[in-house]
């Protein structure tokens, strides 16, 4: 239900990264979606983008969408904080402006580091472990059959499962 405008290859400088980060570096692209005329800006449009993201992610096991939002662009990867600006050419441009930037410099302690597990996530960044994640994930899975949403009318099935069990504890929460 939304018009896809096209892809943009994100310009990067992999030579600033360590060997292991380059070895498992994903292909980094940005996709652009036109807001439908009948959808309001802000949260209504972001809900539609959420559905589109979940459908796209489920199309392939090796697809990870860093962000799909009308409000934010997320840059992340397996590198140190000081390498962020030197890795992404966009962040070196004077044309780029931001009201806020979140940076997290700690790698996961209970899972192997990977590009998709790097912080920040789509909506959050935190320093620690979510100790109740297994119980919460199991409860969400049990409730999926009876879930309803006035905001995702007739499209809730497209975003299920609500929690992907393949990510870190933070990724599970960030996916909802």
Name the predicted role of every residue range.
Residues 1-176:
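Conserved short alpha-helical segments that host acidic/polar catalytic motifs at enzyme active sites
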